[in-house]
């Protein structure tokens, strides 16, 4: 699912107007700030003047890993003036790219099969997207780590005051380990639970989601709306209940509560144009449509 979301965001950031995204209600869950994600996209082209090591630093900042032993999605490898890259969004197509340098200039870009090494074709340009949806700048990361550290101290002290030493110990060990991973690798398992710090959001402020990546004039189509709309309404409450337990028992900081799906009101504010498709529309759809209803007769399969 993560790879599909990466590919979707890459398509939306391409600027094309003919993109169709098919998604479940999970599209309302938190993602990175679109501006921060776009800032980590590296555009390269044949004839581009750039130092090889500078390009490799761009890849590392986008969470690519230098791996000569196991060349897989999200990795790159270096052999002299040649850099092989396996973009994260190409996982399903199985296409990797070879970037050849002549001094400090990109001389050639080609795609190839990472299993056989067979060249597929030449490329004039290439966009390299991050391997992770939660990206941020080094400055923002340093600030976020400081804020996480402060909140950890407050929450540990709170647990000790109310007589929960085991919860305090569990939380301390978990968050300290996560911070070490973030400092070393730039990310950790469950980093989305710290997204509020990396996005610079205040407590309670809505997270960014897939809908923020769409242009302002996008059209939303909700299929089986009599079922989907109630699901959207219930998502926030269900997620909140589960996360509250994680916080109370010391598995997560309170900031994890802000890694959440949108409330129904927030969802409505992001979807100015919508078509509700249903054989049995509820009162909500009928009221929202203000009487603008189109009937469609669908032939039952096998009867005619």
Model-derived features with residue positions:
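ASCE RecA-like P-loop NTPase motor cores
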Residues: 1-304
């Amino acid at each position: 699912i993560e790879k599909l979301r990466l590919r979707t965001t890459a398509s939306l950031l391409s600027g094309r107007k003919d993109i169709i995204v098919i998604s479940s209600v999970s599209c309302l869950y938190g993602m990175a700030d679109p501006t921060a994600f776009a800032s980590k996209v590296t555009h390269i082209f044949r004839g581009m003047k750039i130092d090889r090591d500078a390009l490799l630093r761009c890849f590392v900042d986008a969470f690519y890993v230098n791996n000569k032993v196991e060349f897989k999605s999200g990795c790159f490898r270096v052999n002299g003036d040649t850099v092989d890259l396996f973009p994260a969004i190409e996982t399903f197509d199985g296409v990797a790219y070879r970037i050849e340098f002549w001094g400090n200039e990109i001389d050639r870009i080609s795609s190839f099969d990472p299993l056989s090494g067979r060249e597929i074709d030449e490329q004039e340009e290439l966009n390299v997207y991050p391997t992770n949806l939660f990206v941020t700048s080094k400055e923002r990361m340093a600030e976020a780590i400081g804020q996480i550290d402060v909140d950890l101290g407050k929450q540990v002290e709170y647990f000790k005051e109310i007589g929960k030493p085991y919860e305090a110990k569990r939380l301390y060990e978990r968050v300290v380990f996560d911070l070490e991973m973030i400092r070393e690798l730039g990310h950790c398992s469950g980093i989305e639970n710290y997204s509020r710090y990396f996005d610079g959001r205040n407590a309670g402020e809505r997270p960014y989601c897939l809908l923020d990546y769409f242009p302002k004039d996008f059209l939303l189509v909700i299929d089986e709306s009599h079922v989907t709309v109630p699901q959207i309404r219930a998502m926030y409450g269900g997620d909140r209940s589960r996360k509250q337990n994680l916080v109370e028992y010391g598995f997560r900081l309170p900031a994890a509560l802000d890694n959440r799906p949108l409330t129904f009101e927030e969802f409505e504010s992001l979807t100015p144009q919508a078509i509700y498709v249903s054989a049995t529309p509820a009162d909500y759809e009928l009221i929202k449509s203000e009487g603008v209803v189109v009937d469609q007769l669908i032939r039952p399969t096998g009867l005619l």
